[in-house]
């Protein structure tokens, strides 16, 4: 699931969540 993947990236990246969330 892409949404779950993005959510995981947000947690992993922290402050860098914004650029990854853009994808």
Curated annotation (Swiss-Prot):
<keyword id="KW-0443">Lipid metabolism</keyword>
<dbReference type="GO" id="GO:0090729">
    <property type="term" value="F:toxin activity"/>
</dbReference>
<keyword id="KW-0378">Hydrolase</keyword>
<keyword id="KW-0442">Lipid degradation</keyword>
<keyword id="KW-0959">Myotoxin</keyword>
<keyword id="KW-0800">Toxin</keyword>
<keyword id="KW-0528">Neurotoxin</keyword>
<keyword id="KW-0479">Metal-binding</keyword>
<dbReference type="GO" id="GO:0016042">
    <property type="term" value="P:lipid catabolic process"/>
</dbReference>
<comment type="similarity">
    <text>Belongs to the phospholipase A2 family. Group II subfamily.</text>
</comment>
<dbReference type="GO" id="GO:0004623">
    <property type="term" value="F:phospholipase A2 activity"/>
</dbReference>
<dbReference type="GO" id="GO:0005576">
    <property type="term" value="C:extracellular region"/>
</dbReference>
<keyword id="KW-0638">Presynaptic neurotoxin</keyword>
<protein>
    <recommendedName>
        <fullName>Basic phospholipase A2 intermexin</fullName>
        <ecNumber>3.1.1.4</ecNumber>
    </recommendedName>
</protein>
<keyword id="KW-0106">Calcium</keyword>
<comment type="function">
    <text>Snake venom phospholipase A2 (PLA2) that shows presynaptic neurotoxicity and low myotoxicity. PLA2 catalyzes the calcium-dependent hydrolysis of the 2-acyl groups in 3-sn-phosphoglycerides.</text>
</comment>
<keyword id="KW-0964">Secreted</keyword>
<keyword id="KW-1015">Disulfide bond</keyword>
<dbReference type="GO" id="GO:0046872">
    <property type="term" value="F:metal ion binding"/>
</dbReference>
């Amino acid at each position: 699931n892409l949404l779950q993947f993005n959510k995981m990236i947000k947690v992993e990246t922290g402050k860098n969540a914004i650029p990854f969330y853009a994808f």
